[in-house]
Amino acid sequence: MESKFEFAKELVKKAGQYILDHMQEDLQVETKTSPTDLVTRLDKEVQELLVSEILSRYPEDKICAEEGCLRASVQEGKVWVIDPIDGTNNFVAQQEDFAVMMAYFENGQGQFGLIYDVVKGDCYHGGGAFPVCLNDKPLAPFKAKPLGDFLIAGNSGMLETNEWGLADLSRAVLGVRVYGSAAISFAKILSGRLLTYVTYLQPWDYAAASILGESLGYRVVTLSGETPDFQTRQPVMMVPLEMQEEIQSYIYERKRT
């Protein structure tokens, strides 16, 4: 597993460098499910790079990835979960606050995850048998304090409509931030800058964070407190275990108002 983990760390940085080398070119921006659901040429090319490198090294492994039709179940065999560019809208509009994410599972058990903030060069990596680090610095486990002392992150639409009670939760904390990227939001939780992140996500958006967070006292759950299915888009949050009940008291089964 050590060699596979080292391979993954090198690979996300290779993907990040590919983005940096080509991000000033024509991105060929297209829309997918809505005008704000963007995909670029580099999303596709970076995914192709990652998949090609993985399968050339580990031909028996399977892939679940954002672009295209690669949808292997993490419950069966050796599976890589890939988000080639998380925060594509940020990438297109700002050319910062986006990341490459990868996670590796064996028969449903997360072995390690990686979140690579391409512009900052920050790589969050580890989980499973590996310590969770930011670059080479181990990250501290969650440390509790009063709810009102924390910032949280969320989905602006959910906040506006109080869907799942997110606005109620926001009034109980210090403030809310909207970063436009699951990867960036999760990275801020892992580094102790946020308490939780509440939104709708696909499996490739939360897979890496679910593995990284577990080693630091966090878990990714649906908004009803269950384990995500790792197959469909679901309302989820990343929360510290010791404050999950308090956080969930604001949002458990709270629907759109």
What are these regions (language model features)?
Residues 107, 135-136:
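Short strand-turn-strand beta-turns centered on an Asx-Gly dipeptide
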Residues 74-130:
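DPxDG-like acidic metal-binding loop motif
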Residues 19, 43, 54, 88, ...:
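Residue-level signal for inorganic ion chemistry
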